[in-house]
């Protein structure tokens, strides 16, 4: 299967389906359409007997810059919900699809990853990244809460203190730091990333899908309840903070091209 929409490219070879996020001018930031298309593509791959493994990457210099802040600001200004607390929003559709995806998921991080561009890696079975990749979870700098059960999955991957820094600091993490923490499995030169990730995905895809599914289920099923509980907590906290003083200041600062001033906000914000 080869199918290219404007924002998500799909290509099959050797039982590996490669999904390439294709909003390079927006650094592959997730708007509602990309959330929905990637969720649908994962569901389709899960049901397709010709697919054994999915490989996810991005076009251009970014893996994904996270949620599209322009769209978030428009939703907040209009009194809407940017998604983490809304069942029908594409964000939750994507997280549902990631949780339900029962085949191996390989990520090839081709550049920077922010927000959901980091937290979705908690659902990947193997993560490859270029040596120049960088990672950031900017939740506190946006005045919001974690997402996608990252408050549970990231500590599972990297340990409590590393996770606390990643989730609380809103600072960049280098590819080398991500590898040392356990967020990334292999680092590659940029020109070798896709060949390396594809080679490993193809080796997995040559094995019985039934056995691959069984291994993944055995590894993930013990965590299912805690992932669901983490999502509920995060969605509630995200909804409470979205459109609040800190989030409004962060979005205003982004629109105005300045640093946010959280110190001047009311106590407790």
Task: Please identify what each model-predicted range represents.
Residues 34-37, 87-90, 234:
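Hydrophobic alpha-helical membrane-association signature
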Residues 1-18, 22, 171-205, 213-223, ...:
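Amphipathic alpha-helical segments at domain termini/boundaries
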Residues 58-97, 113, 141-143, 226:
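Glycine- (often His-adjacent) and acidic-residue-rich active-site loop
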Residues 1-59, 96:
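Conserved CoA-thioester-binding segment of acyl-CoA-metabolizing enzymes
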Residues 29, 54, 86, 166, ...:
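Short, hydrophobic secondary-structure boundary micro-motifs
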Residues 19, 23, 38, 56, ...:
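Terminal peptide-recognition signature
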Residues 96-212, 236, 240, 244, ...:
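Crotonase-fold acyl-CoA enzyme core
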